[in-house]
């Protein structure tokens, strides 16, 4: 999350043949760029991207009635769909320009009519799109949205405009203007991806959850295509295992359909390592789904916590142990005496919550499915065979300095001659 890990390990990784990608949400500069439109291969992806954005940018679990959510999604699908279809040659399918999410914000500015009797620029653009590509999915969604009138329509536009206002920042636009993440190569090419996420401000963290949502979708389909022989020149042996090491998982934001992803990616040569400080972080983010997520993790490594709920969870998870007790008693009197012996079998937690809390700073508890818990010493990075190649400070020869080229805002308008006049006017506004 702090962005230091890439500096400490980047040079070692490149030396060993890895391509290094950096997605910096702290400074929003000197970063690789991520554009979801780059990974939209069919109109079905319009719905997937729309839902990922809605999930990633919502501010709370209480989004109001389902009617408003669905109405907003309808407009969002129409606008994203417009960009998807308009950016392709209707005859050849060739890419005329590469849209981005900032363009959706531009389209939203052109939805309102200045004159009630004159169609808005966006209305005209949809009609032109329908003439060029009759029956397209975007126009169908737009016509459904057109059924809303008056305040209902205005409210839906206002809600979606608020959601997309984040893309008015130039730095955010630059970050999503193009794509250098090359997600579709991660499971066939040695790649290390670092995502720097702010720990004190989550304004832009939704971009990381969208990145993961798109990444899981793209990589799952790519793995399936390879495993089913649909990628010439590739077979199972070419499929590299991908590890998602999600440190400070609670900072990423809610990843759409994460419970389903966690249970399905194992067969696609992917695994996820979730790193948390406390159980309640996961519960706050995923509500009742947190138990499903925990149960889908075959191995738990406990390194320490101050959280009571977490201590109790792993105390219960450790199971019970049997304790045998024996007590004897003797009585004496003037004439005779007696003695007795009592044996009992009792159960107690193998580790009580306070015992879980008091494991040594150099120790950890390991829980593996269908196995007894065991306590072991923590591994040290200084014992790793490549520890000499890891940097410790900026003055270290192994410190990795990188440069990722930015994109000027003018570079967003590729192939501007292929845009409709109305679309050009929105960009010029």
List where the protein language model places each region.
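Intrinsically disordered, low-complexity N-terminal regions enriched in serine/proline/glycine
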Residues: 83, 96, 313, 331-333, ...
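Short, charged/polar low-complexity linear motifs in solvent-exposed/disordered segments
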Residues: 212-213, 220-222, 300, 320, ...
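Short loop or secondary-structure boundary microenvironments that flank
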Residues: 197, 201, 248, 276, ...
